[in-house]
A protein has these predicted regions:
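Short, glycine-/small-residue-rich phosphate/pyrophosphate-handling segment
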Residues: 97-147
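Glycine-rich phosphate-binding loop
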Residues: 55-97
């Protein structure tokens, strides 16, 4: 009996630092919920620029279809990766102790013409929204994944309806 083969990753998650690992966990959990294979790397745009360049230049050839890049402070990682790959890059600005993540957000969102980085929120919603955006990109041409996204959004709406009912009619 042969061992079960792990599917090749479609999404690459790249952290600028391992200190971002806890913050990015909801992203990985959401990708898992959608059954999207992914890989996780720690590569710094500033401390390991050669590795960042190699990762970006080989990502499409290795079968990745989307890159999620999380970085804080002088958060250049998403932009560096976007400048070197034809794949869509989603930037996740990490919260920082000095400016609360505003520095990260502005570093990621202010890209020059021709080098887009899709940017999500700082804080808890950012990693989850990055995974959902990656899923929506991948769902183009994948009806089963598209249906999983539709059902996810139905569950979100149901939770809001329950919360509304609870506040309108308290026990």
């Amino acid at each position: 009996m042969s061992p079960k083969k792990t599917p090749a990753p479609l999404v690459g998650i790249v952290l600028g630092s391992d200190s971002d690992l806890e913050t990015i966990q909801p992203c990985m959990a959401t990708l898992k919920e959608f059954a999207i294979p992914h890989e996780l790397r720690v590569i710094s745009a500033h401390r390991t620029p050669d590795a960042a360049h190699e990762y970006a230049r080989t990502a499409a050839h290795r079968g990745l279809r989307v890159i999620i890049a999380a970085a804080g402070g002088a958060a250049h990682l998403p932009g560096v990766l976007a400048s070197l790959t034809p794949l869509p890059v989603i930037g996740v600005p990490m919260p920082t102790s000095v400016l609360g993540g505003l520095d990260s957000l502005l570093s990621i969102v202010q890209m020059p013409s021709g080098i887009p980085v899709a940017t999500v929120a700082v804080g808890k919603a950012g990693p989850v929204n990055a995974a959902i955006l990656a899923a929506q990109i991948l769902a183009e041409g994948d009806a089963a994944l598209r249906e999983r996204i539709v059902q996810y959004k139905v569950r979100l709406a149901e939770r809001v309806a329950i919360a509304d009912e609870n506040v309108r009619n308290p026990p």
